[in-house]
C-alpha cells in the first residue's frame, strides 16, 4: 500500500525529465472521472500545496484565461469517459493552436496527469 507521504508528495520526476516546472505549463488536462480528482491532481502535480487546491481554484485560476487552464474541452465529466484519450486530443489541438474558442493563447507546453502523479508533458515546436 502507498503511504500518505508517497501519495501526497508532488511528482517532480516529470518536470526534472522535461527540464520544466509547473509554472512552465500553459494548459493542463487531468483525469477527472470524479470531480475531487481535479483538486487532488493539482496538488499531486505541484500546482499548489497539499490541502490547498480548494483555495487554489478560486477566482477562476483554472478556467480558460486563468493562471492554469484545466480540462479546456470540459474533461471526462463533460466529454465522456474515454480514459484520457479525448484529453490527449485536446492537448494536440491546444499545441497546434486549433482549439477554436477553447484555445489557450500562445500555448506551447501542455501536461496530462492524474491524482496519483502519472504525467506526460508535451511541447510544440515553439518550446
Regions found by a protein language model. Name each.
Residues 1-127:
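Claisen-condensing/thiolase-fold acyl-transfer catalytic domains that form or cleave C-C bonds
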